[in-house]
């Protein structure tokens, strides 16, 4: 299964109109980020893909003690000079991800639980407007009884 943050990164990179709109400036925490690519040094507009981690959620006391489903979350952060640019780029990202998911094998995609935005805000440190498009998914893993631990 492809990690959620890599799906989001690949979706953004695959959309030529979106890449043109942001001048090709995409940074992702799923790869090592050089000091030149860190958020505060990136010109506007830009996109930052963040991996927000995973957590296990067993259903009941009777659930198996071997976790087979994980809740994962990743987001696309859009930074821009104007609020309207943030809105436009968030919508472009949402469409890019939806198109990209259709190109993947069903087995490679996590189950989507929710998509939400954080809401536009002003970052006085950069300074810029920003918003986050947050994807929450469930990833299922199956184990064979004879499977060795990794």
List the model feature ranges, each with a label.
Residues 1-61, 84, 146-150:
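Small/polar-rich, solvent-exposed N-terminal microdomains that initiate assembly or binding
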Residues 7-18, 92, 96-104:
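Generic non-transmembrane alpha-helical segments
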Residues 38, 63-65, 124:
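Residues embedded in well-ordered secondary-structure elements
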Residues 40-42, 67, 110, 128:
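A generic structural signal for short, non-catalytic loop/turn and secondary-structure boundary residues
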Residues 64-81, 128-141:
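Oligomerization/assembly interface segments of phage tail-like spikes and tubes
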Residues 65-66, 77-100:
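Extracellular/virion structural assembly segments
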Residues 95-150:
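Acidic-leaning, charged glycine-interspersed low-complexity segments
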